């Protein structure tokens, strides 16, 4: 038998195997896709209650990093001025700020929003009462 004949036999056997294997895999994928989830499937898992969720969060947070100080910024809106408008600013000038409702501000770490809240008076000082936390990545 020549080398060419051996090669042709190998190619034919591979083609037969590939066709059968591909067909079986396709049937298996189709069955899995449309199968009903059973009680033990990942879809049937119950959501953890609040106590379990708090414990998981405490376990995930490294305690050594808890004392790390972060610089946060309180943003109460945005405005855009030309250089000429900036030069004309004087005491008593009122600037219209956009991007946030009056009395509200956004708490940020760098460019990442951490929380939103309402500006409040805390013993004569400005404070932020959190009304909504940003989703964690």
UniProtKB/Swiss-Prot annotation:
Keywords: Cytoplasm, Virulence. Coiled coil: none annotated. GO terms for biological process: bacterial-type flagellum-dependent swarming motility; positive chemotaxis. Residues 1-67 are annotated as: Disordered. Residues 23-33 have a biased composition (Basic and acidic residues). Its main location: cytoplasm. GO terms for molecular function: cytoskeletal motor activity. Residues 1-22, 36-58 have a biased composition (Acidic residues). It is found in: Cytoplasm. It comes from the Bacteria. It holds the Pfam family FliMN_C. GO terms for cellular component: bacterial-type flagellum basal body; cytoplasm. Homotetramer. The four monomers assemble into two tightly bound homodimers. Interacts with HrcQa. Belongs to the FliN/MopA/SpaO family. The HrcQb-C domain interacts with the HrcQa C-terminal domain. Component of the type III secretion system, which is required for effector protein delivery, parasitism, and pathogenicity. Probably participates in the formation of a C-ring-like assembly along with HrcQa. This is Type III secretion protein HrcQb. It comes from Pseudomonas syringae pv. tomato (strain ATCC BAA-871 / DC3000). The gene is hrcQb.
């Amino acid at each position: 038998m020549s080398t060419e004949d051996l090669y042709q036999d190998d190619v034919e056997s591979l083609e037969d195997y590939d066709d059968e294997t591909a067909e079986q895999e396709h049937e298996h994928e189709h069955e899995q896709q449309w199968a009903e989830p059973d009680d033990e499937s990942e879809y049937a898992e119950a959501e953890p209650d609040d106590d379990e969720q708090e414990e998981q969060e405490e376990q995930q947070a490294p305690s050594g990093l808890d004392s790390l100080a972060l610089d946060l910024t309180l943003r109460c809106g945005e405005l855009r001025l030309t250089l000429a408008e900036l030069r004309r600013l004087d005491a008593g000038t009122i600037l219209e700020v956009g991007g946030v409702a009056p009395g509200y501000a956004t708490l940020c770490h760098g460019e990442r929003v951490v929380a939103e809240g309402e500006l409040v008076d805390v013993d004569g000082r400005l404070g932020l009462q959190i009304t909504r936390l940003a989703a964690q990545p």
